[in-house]
């Protein structure tokens, strides 16, 4: 079976974005394509439910644009084994377990790629999360600055409720850096209409 990754750019098209792409420092969403379906991972607030969903390849995604496709080695596993792997991964990657820095769509794509092809995704696709974890104080300062600028533009949001928000620097990172303030942001959403269950769509 042919396997490839669709890469989507989360940064607006600009000279800075072009430089980030050249340096491998962009912010990307990825999905793994297998047998005409694209499998990806996103966040939602349904307890015990997967965040893995399947769509047609290159679906329209709000806030990002398709950048390229990257071929992986072929998957030589029998179809029942492929289905079992995808179902198991969908149980491990729940919507509530999503973390922008420690468990994002690229982590799922990498796990699926390794299990199905024996090959990881290119490291630049998730480099920004590794940088964010290595420098959590700087990451939070930058993100809080961005959040402040966003709230200056739209002050209609109710800051007292963070039910739909998610902490960017999670507890494991905070243990090493206790002075990091909490910063919350809405995580990317899973396609709730196409979640993987005990059988593949």
From Swiss-Prot:
Residues 1-143 form the PPPDE domain. GO terms for biological process: meiotic cell cycle; proteolysis. Its EC number is 3.4.-.-. It comes from Schizosaccharomyces pombe (strain 972 / ATCC 24843). Its main location: cytoplasm. Keywords: Cytoplasm, Hydrolase, Meiosis, Protease. This is DeSI-like protein sdu1. Belongs to the DeSI family. Residues 152-167 have a biased composition (Acidic residues). Gene3D superfamilies: PPPDE domains. One of its GO terms (molecular function) is deubiquitinase activity.
């Amino acid at each position: 079976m042919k396997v490839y990754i669709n890469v989507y750019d989360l940064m607006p098209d600009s000279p800075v974005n072009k430089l980030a792409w050249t340096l491998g420092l962009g912010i990307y969403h990825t999905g793994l394509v297998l047998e005409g379906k694209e499998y990806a991972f996103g966040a939602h607030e349904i307890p015990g439910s997967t965040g893995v969903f399947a769509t047609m390849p290159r679906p329209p995604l709000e806030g990002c644009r398709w950048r390229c496709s990257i071929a992986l080695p072929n998957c030589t596993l029998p179809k029942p084994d492929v289905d079992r792997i995808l179902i198991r991964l969908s149980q491990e990657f729940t919507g509530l377990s999503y973390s922008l820095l420690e468990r994002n769509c690229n982590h799922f794509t990498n796990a699926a790629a390794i299990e199905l092809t024996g090959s990881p995704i290119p490291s630049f696709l998730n480099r920004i999360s590794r940088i964010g974890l290595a420098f959590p104080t700087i990451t939070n300062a930058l993100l809080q600055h961005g959040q402040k600028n966003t709230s200056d533009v739209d002050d209609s949001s109710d800051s007292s409720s963070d039910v739909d928000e998610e902490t960017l620097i999670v507890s494991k990172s905070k243990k090493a850096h206790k002075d990091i303030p909490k910063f919350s942001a809405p995580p990317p959403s899973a396609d709730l209409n196409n979640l993987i269950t005990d059988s593949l769509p």
